[in-house]
């Protein structure tokens, strides 16, 4: 049996493949958290913690409907539904950085913060994996720079 080895390396600043994002249909929203996070300790706290991080980082946030998304690498996240082309200004008082961004980018940023804190709190490898799946998508996002300013 012969094994073929690939020696071509992708440039460090370019992903090997583009991740795709898929909105979760309304009828599947009820299964979102248990399906993707059900094996993680205290997974029921994730959604309220994400809301709390958004409230902490975004002065203009006052609640609302959030959309759920899945990623082709097995990741999942949520973001607030915007009004038209509304942008959000996030300020992270923990690092002093702020950034103006789309609702999707804001959702990614606060999910990354919440996932990181939850992974540390629970010491759960599966939660850490969720963080890195979403971070991989964030690195390919058109607003990667703004997201990284907030989570730095």
UniProtKB/Swiss-Prot annotation:
InterPro entries: Antirestrict (IPR004914), Antirestriction_sf (IPR042297). It holds the Pfam family Antirestrict. Belongs to the antirestriction protein family. This is Uncharacterized protein YafX. It comes from Escherichia coli (strain K12).
